[in-house]
Amino acid sequence: MLSTILNAFQVADIRKKLAFTAGMLLIYRLGSHIPVPGVNLTAVNAIQKSFGGSNILGLLNLFSGGSLSRLALFALGIMPYITSSIILQLLQVAVPSLEKLSKEGEVGQARITQYTRYLTVGLAFAQSIGYVFLFHTLQAKAGESVVTHFDAPHIFLIVICLTTGCVMLMWIGELITQRGIGNGISLLIFASIVSRLPAGIQAWWTTPNQVFKVMMPFLVLAIVAGIVFVQEGQRRIPVQYAKRVIGRRMTEGGQTYLPLRVNMAGVIPVIFAASIMAFPPTVGQLVKTHWGQQVSDFFSPNGWHYVVGESIFIVIFTYFYTAVTFNPVDQADNLKKYGGFIPGVRPGRPTAEFLDRILARLTFPGALFLAAVAALPTILIARTHQNIQLGGTSILIVIGVALETMKQLEAQLMMRSYEGFLK
């Protein structure tokens, strides 16, 4: 890993991509400390503890990189965009016109991306209104109003600023994906979680529970090792290519393999599941009624309802995103088109069924592992009554995004080495 990073800095083009990515992430972190206009900073500082625990506000604050607790420009984080992406991907299965659009190549994907952006703006606007009223209800803890003037013009100004911040984050994420290294949206969440690491380490170090203090580092190391093992694990399907006559020349047949990863979906299912499970308690916090409080308590991040629900969604999204990433029918058609076949399996439909069966067997343990890693640290923190935000979901996202970014960096280096060879 270290050699890959050192080699990357020796290539001018990759060096520019890394610098661009770092610059965009720096802008994100700066925006996370810029308060929106019309906010009483003294009152905001007085309610910081409400966002420091392992409740739903602490979880939302974690994914916003601490911006929510400061009611900063990027307080919404990137969650509205992720929610919009989930909705559009699910609609592609249910709505025939969207399904047809998704199969029209780059033009269709560009249209779907545009719809995702529009939906993001709508969700961000609605969520901004909810957050303004949420902070207004927290004034009892602050002793004074968080919003300096709670009237329509000032509320509208704050809502517009928060919505603009979310749209700006969406734009930064897309820019990183296009001109930088790695997936921009994943890297923004990665930066948010990493920025909260010092607070998590301090909470662990100052805990009076000595058993928890000793166990936590070993648990984290075991989780990291397990994530790397599963993320890098793959089954290699042997592929044989027959001899082919091209013009007057006969090409030699060869043997290679088709790598099927244990966790082909990567860290996306975990991000999607966390986004879905954050929705009910967020609504419960915004609706200041007895029913709303019950919903918020029922889906508390440390409750077993939340853990079970998140685990189920992780398994579902792992299968769903694996199906989006790898299509056995298309893979079988490509093998048949170029004269390839799997020994002992007939080309065409039998090959597709074989790949689908193997992929299902690989995906199931991978999905269960992701769900277990997300749940176990959360259960441990809840049972030991520790006030630490960094649970299994956070560790999964950080390690998963780091591994995927390193793979993209290695792919960029390999591509540049081939270009140098051809020159």
Tell me the role of every PLM-derived stretch:
Residues M1-S102, V107-K423:
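N-terminal cationic and glycine-rich segments that engage phosphates or anionic surfaces
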